[in-house]
UniProtKB/Swiss-Prot annotation:
Plants overexpressing MPT3/PHT3;1 display increased sensitivity to salt stress. It is a multi-pass membrane protein. The gene is MPT3. Transport of phosphate groups from the cytosol to the mitochondrial matrix. Mediates salt stress tolerance through an ATP-dependent pathway and via modulation of the gibberellin metabolism. This is Mitochondrial phosphate carrier protein 3, mitochondrial. Expressed in stems, leaves and flowers. Strong expression in vascular tissues. InterPro entries: Mitochondrial_sb/sol_carrier, Mt_carrier_dom_sf, SLC25A3/Pic2/Mir1-like. It comes from Arabidopsis thaliana. Solcar repeats lie at residues 76-160, 173-257, 274-353. Residues 97-134, 197-231, 294-332 are mitochondrial matrix. Residues 155-175, 252-272, 354-375 are mitochondrial intermembrane. GO terms for molecular function: mRNA binding; phosphate transmembrane transporter activity. Pfam families: Mito_carr (PF00153). Keywords: Membrane, Mitochondrion, Mitochondrion inner membrane, Repeat, Transit peptide, Transmembrane, Transmembrane helix, Transport. The lineage of its organism: Eukaryota, Viridiplantae, Streptophyta, Embryophyta, Tracheophyta.
Amino acid sequence: MESPKNSLIPSFLYSSSSSPRSFLLDQVLNSNSNAAFEKSPSPAPRSSPTSMISRKNFLIASPTEPGKGIEMYSPAFYAACTFGGILSCGLTHMTVTPLDLVKCNMQIDPAKYKSISSGFGILLKEQGVKGFFRGWVPTLLGYSAQGACKFGFYEYFKKTYSDLAGPEYTAKYKTLIYLAGSASAEIIADIALCPFEAVKVRVQTQPGFARGMSDGFPKFIKSEGYGGLYKGLAPLWGRQIPYTMMKFASFETIVEMIYKYAIPNPKSECSKGLQLGVSFAGGYVAGVFCAIVSHPADNLVSFLNNAKGATVGDAVKKIGMVGLFTRGLPLRIVMIGTLTGAQWGLYDAFKVFVGLPTTGGVAPAPAIAATEAKA
């Protein structure tokens, strides 16, 4: 049984491979053991395997998924989560570029783009099929960078805050751990996303502005300056931080409830296919909540990045408070629900591919230790 104190030891002390320090320790311990054996006139008492292991290395091994070599909460674990985030966010956002394009234009020019169907019709008539994928390069690059930071730092902050809180408080306030970890990760992720988002919106809502990222980026800088790339950072935080807090906390809670009430077997006994299905379902429901919570700020981001010198006050005056909450919302619910479900499905599929467990359905590490200690 694992001691609850083990989870409070910093993650850098977990080891599965020999570091220079552990190698030196092994050499010292081995030399001492050999010297004692040579001085002994008779064979030493037979040691148990456990005692031999404890003499060889006193560092605590981090848990691993059977059959694979990636330790939980090791640098390789965070690298895998980071790469999974790149795949899940970059590819999914690029795929829904046509929906995003119509949504942005409905927010900017509702008199022209009155509905989803008419919006697609207008784009097809004016720009052709190619017009549906205008801005896909900044979308792919921006959301790949955001996904890397979002998922990688979420796993890091979730573990860090769990360690700081300790087993008892982590078990009691795990939702707060999810909220704090996701908010911290999104602050960093949006700094990476913001320049790409600014260019993307300008390219998508002003067809004559630029063809894409290669010519749009220098044109934007020439027009707005480098500071203009981060003009929408505060509204972007206002959109993405509540979105991500809802995305991760609700997903973790929904998945836990699915395994608790809808599936008769524990998660550990479910097939990987079923676990990935749960990830998609939990992600889709979480995405609906995300869209509702973050939609007013999404309207602000689109408005500010579309017009030079525009302010939040201008946006509120032109769109109105009701419009901030409702303009383009049905399309965004469909888009974000599908997007979030696909993101969690892809992210967990990659984790399974590299031998890691899927996300959710279990408590954070210190909380698990506390449960085991009470058993």
